[in-house]
Amino acid sequence: MSDIEARVKKIIAEQLGVEESQVTNEKAFVADLGADSLDTVELVMALEDEFGIEIPDEDAEKITTVQNAVDYATKNQKA
C-alpha cells in the first residue's frame, strides 16, 4: 500500500467513523460505508487539506469510492 493510499484510507475511516480495516479500495462511500451527502462533502474537504489540493465540484461528484479518492490524490497531490 502506498503512503498516499494509507493516508486516504485513514482520512476516510476518521471522517466516516468506520474501522480502517473496512476501508478497502472497492468500497463506495454511500452504499458500502454509510456516508451521506454531508459526509462526502466533509471527506472531500479533508482530502483537500491533507494533500494541499483543490477539488472542483465536478471532480468531487466523481469521487465515490475509496479507489477514486486514492487515484485522485495520487494524480493531483502537491507534494
Swiss-Prot record:
It is found in: Cytoplasm. Residues 2-77 form the Carrier domain. One of its GO terms (biological process) is lipid A biosynthetic process. Belongs to the acyl carrier protein (ACP) family. Disulfide bonds: none annotated. It comes from the Bacteria. GO terms for cellular component: cytosol; membrane. GO terms for molecular function: acyl binding; acyl carrier activity; phosphopantetheine binding. Its main location: cytoplasm. This is Acyl carrier protein. 4'-phosphopantetheine is transferred from CoA to a specific serine of apo-ACP by AcpS. This modification is essential for activity because fatty acids are bound in thioester linkage to the sulfhydryl of the prosthetic group. The keyword Cytoplasm applies. The modification O-(pantetheine 4'-phosphoryl)serine is found at S37. SUPFAM superfamilies: ACP-like (SSF47336). The keyword Lipid biosynthesis applies. Pathway: Lipid metabolism; fatty acid biosynthesis. Carrier of the growing fatty acid chain in fatty acid biosynthesis.
